[in-house]
Amino acid sequence: MVDEATKRTLAAIPLLKTRAGPRDKDQWVGRLKEELVSLIKYVENNKKQDNDWFRLESNKEGTRWFGKCWYVHNLLKYEFDVEFDIPVTYPGTAPEIALPELDGKTAKMYRGGKICLTDHFKPLWARNVPKFGIAHAMALGLGPWLAVEIPDLVEKGIIVHKEKTSSE
């Protein structure tokens, strides 16, 4: 079941057409352009809705992505480094998004801080190859993961807001 807000968000993210990964040289350049258009549109939409929650950039080849993501809980902003590599089998395989500083702090995470998307997101990705891209991974993967995990980690005292730790 997908709620209406998720449907609206998803509908506003451009779908991709090119089935190409990093090993596909010229086709990868085309796919990367589609990825950037989709990401830019998603970020623009988020800003319009006052829902800006991540920044991403990539290496020159578009195979390694990194940046920051954040989640606001109880009016406090929790910010994390985010990183992922584009798999060689992309877009057939979704990227494994990692939040390295949360490594080992929740059961819904694999070694290296890779967030668990196996049960919900990966089957959805598989049904939508090659239409889904990085923006979709952020919107349907990392975003919902943060919304579930960060409040839980805060309530359990596993993560503490930076201002609280510096004032103690």
UniProtKB/Swiss-Prot annotation:
GO biological processes: protein ufmylation; response to endoplasmic reticulum stress; reticulophagy
Superkingdom of origin: Eukaryota
- Which InterPro entries does the record match to this protein? UBQ-conjugating_enzyme/RWD, Ufc1
Q: Which residues are responsible for catalysis?
A: C116
Q: Name one GO molecular function term.
A: UFM1 transferase activity
Q: Which UniProt keywords apply?
A: Ubl conjugation pathway
Q: Name one Pfam family in it.
A: UFC1
**Family recorded in the similarity comment:** Belongs to the ubiquitin-conjugating enzyme family. UFC1 subfamily.
**Role noted for this protein:** E2-like enzyme which forms an intermediate with UFM1 via a thioester linkage.
Record protein name field: Ubiquitin-fold modifier-conjugating enzyme 1
What are the top taxonomic ranks of the organism? Eukaryota, Metazoa, Placozoa, Uniplacotomia, Trichoplacea
